[in-house]
Design a protein with these regions (language model features):
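C-terminal catalytic "cap/lid" subdomain
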Residues: 1-257
């Protein structure tokens, strides 16, 4: 089974997104797509007169912004992808974590920063997701979950994909693929061909200490290594254009322990 997470920069590029959806639709066997939000929520919020607040690159999800991301991520972005996949013969079904109680979370506790209505995953409903897959459906998850009190929570898509992969890996072999706009983890951010083909915990720590791996790539890789340690067979980070090749092992960065 392949669980594929697609980033916001791909979602914001209509041509790149169309190409990705075609390649995803052609993956053999069971597959799940988890998508980020892109910049559409910021645009829609602006049109509605709602302020978008960010800190350290992360969105602050207050009550008005939660309404926006629910509409945009769970509605517009998700359903556009589902419609695109259906047109390609992929029997996709669009979901949030609230649908079928697929992903239960709790509201992130306030430490130094109050991120608002942001969720940390507690439980993945494996029987429900397995039922969909067994009936030939490909779930497409928006980055939204819910808590026991019925609140919708904005949820990091990288973490959501990792948690789904970890939960499903207890029953079968799972590949987790993070697709974004680069060819993989790069030694030189200015050189798209400087892909690190294999990354171990030792080389990861080395590259972090040398400043080669930094900023937003660190939480992505932390999620990747956590998934491998929890039983996911393979984690790959790649360009959305190289999805098929990455799954076959000939493109992107493969995470190993």
């Amino acid at each position: 089974m392949n669980i594929v997470k697609i980033g916001g920069n791909v979602i914001d590029d209509a041509e790149k997104l169309a190409g990705f959806l075609y390649r995803f639709s052609r993956l053999p066997g069971k597959k799940i797509l988890v998508h980020g939000g892109g910049k559409i929520a910021t645009r829609v919020a602006g049109e509605l007169g709602i302020e978008s607040r960010m800190t350290e690159g992360r969105r602050i999800t207050d009550a008005p912004m939660r309404d926006v991301v629910t509409m945009v991520y769970g509605g517009l972005v998700n359903k556009r992808m589902v419609a695109g996949l259906q047109s390609l013969g992929c029997n996709a079904i669009g979901l949030t974590g609230a649908d079928g109680a697929a992903i239960l979370s709790h509201k992130r506790p306030v430490k130094t920063i109050d991120y608002g209505y942001v969720g940390d995953v507690e439980k993945v409903n494996v029987p429900f997701i397995t039922l969909l897959l067994q009936n030939g459906l490909s779930p497409v998850f928006a980055p939204l979950t819910f808590d026991a009190g019925g609140d919708i929570l904005n949820t990091n898509a990288d973490t959501q994909a990792s948690e789904i992969a970890r939960a499903l890996s207890r029953g079968e072999a799972v590949n987790l693929v993070y697709c974004f706009e680069k060819k993989g983890v790069l030694k030189d951010a200015a050189d798209d061909d400087s892909v690190i083909s294999r990354l171990t915990p030792e080389t990861y720590e080395q590259y972090k200490s040398e400043g080669i791996i930094y900023d937003g790539m660190i939480p992505k890789l932390d999620n990747a290594f956590a998934a491998i340690r929890a039983g996911v067979r393979k984690v790959i980070i790649c360009d959305a254009d190289d999805l098929a090749e990455a799954v076959e092992g000939s493109a992107g960065t493969t995470i190993e322990i």
